[in-house]
Amino acid sequence: MKKYKPKSGERIERQEEVIPPKVELPFEFSPEHYPVLLQEVLAAFYPLRDKKELSYFDGTFGRGGHYMALKYAYPQMKATVMDQDLAAIAFAQSRFQTEVEKGQLNVIHGNFTQFSEHNLNNFDMMLLDLGVSSPQLDQGERGFSFYNDGPLDMRMNQQQGLTAEVLINTASEDELIRIFKEYGEVYRPSRVVRAIVNDRKTKAFQTTGALAGLIERVDGWQVKGHHPATKYFMALRLAVNSELEVVAEAIPKMIRALNPGGRLAVISFHSLEDRIVKNIFRESEDLGRTVTKKVIVPTQEECDRNSRSRSAKLRIFERSAQDELTKL
């Protein structure tokens, strides 16, 4: 059979040569929080398995679930991890003290947009697991969840930034409408916003329960199984932490920090985040390629096991190898 020759200017989609096998994790694998899309993330880095040395960067360490599994699958890996949540940093330094002392793990407190400030480069594997971790959702005092009453905080880094309480009690009616429409994709937030502005004149909103109760009273349960406050809380969290802007700023830098042939995997939980990731990957095709045409989503089995995973989306970018760069 003759080898196909592309026409001038024609782009060829490179296909994966190997279907990665499922990684059977040991019985003692027991992360505090079972990570989303774990097997899919392990598969994303499978083509790098034969490298004698592997460098890994995790910009959203959380409770280290992905790190633990990757360390088991690729024992030659050395890792640098970041998180802006001090609780996650304290957990990493305690749970993985041995790895830190051996120089196998470098733990840094900060937002992943700051990784270039630490002169971090030349990674084979990079991962971002965007959104809120389960421990953050389960702790009412963090203010992320309407199911656990607590102060309206919502800051990923509690040492800095505006709280959701300040935002909800001081932003203008027009600004709140913009936030809920733009970040939460709420179709008609005007009634809820008017109620917020009216009620805060007599008593400021201080707790998640108070805000969720107002939204439930005004909006009602429009979709079965989805609390009416879901999109409103997500919009506030995105606004408080400037999450969309952070993603747009960080990903191009991370692509350039990859070694030739290295891969960046990004898990998002919001359509706007996923759109940003997709567009940046497309705009970066002079540096590499998007590994899969279609976005990767959790299996039904995973969604049944962990309902919080149902909106997760995974995209993978591969930096061109040096020998490929000369051919393009």
Curated annotation (Swiss-Prot):
<comment type="similarity">
    <text>Belongs to the methyltransferase superfamily. RsmH family.</text>
</comment>
<dbReference type="InterPro" id="IPR023397">
    <property type="entry name" value="SAM-dep_MeTrfase_MraW_recog"/>
</dbReference>
<feature type="binding site">
    <location>
        <position position="83"/>
    </location>
    <ligand>
        <name>S-adenosyl-L-methionine</name>
    </ligand>
</feature>
<feature type="binding site">
    <location>
        <position position="129"/>
    </location>
    <ligand>
        <name>S-adenosyl-L-methionine</name>
    </ligand>
</feature>
<keyword id="KW-0963">Cytoplasm</keyword>
<feature type="binding site">
    <location>
        <begin position="64"/>
        <end position="66"/>
    </location>
    <ligand>
        <name>S-adenosyl-L-methionine</name>
    </ligand>
</feature>
<dbReference type="InterPro" id="IPR029063">
    <property type="entry name" value="SAM-dependent_MTases_sf"/>
</dbReference>
<dbReference type="GO" id="GO:0071424">
    <property type="term" value="F:rRNA (cytosine-N4-)-methyltransferase activity"/>
</dbReference>
<feature type="binding site">
    <location>
        <position position="136"/>
    </location>
    <ligand>
        <name>S-adenosyl-L-methionine</name>
    </ligand>
</feature>
<keyword id="KW-0949">S-adenosyl-L-methionine</keyword>
<dbReference type="InterPro" id="IPR002903">
    <property type="entry name" value="RsmH"/>
</dbReference>
<feature type="binding site">
    <location>
        <position position="112"/>
    </location>
    <ligand>
        <name>S-adenosyl-L-methionine</name>
    </ligand>
</feature>
<keyword id="KW-0489">Methyltransferase</keyword>
<dbReference type="GO" id="GO:0070475">
    <property type="term" value="P:rRNA base methylation"/>
</dbReference>
<keyword id="KW-0808">Transferase</keyword>
<dbReference type="GO" id="GO:0005737">
    <property type="term" value="C:cytoplasm"/>
</dbReference>
<keyword id="KW-0698">rRNA processing</keyword>
<protein>
    <recommendedName>
        <fullName>Ribosomal RNA small subunit methyltransferase H</fullName>
        <ecNumber>2.1.1.199</ecNumber>
    </recommendedName>
</protein>
<comment type="function">
    <text>Specifically methylates the N4 position of cytidine in position 1402 (C1402) of 16S rRNA.</text>
</comment>
<dbReference type="Pfam" id="PF01795">
    <property type="entry name" value="Methyltransf_5"/>
</dbReference>
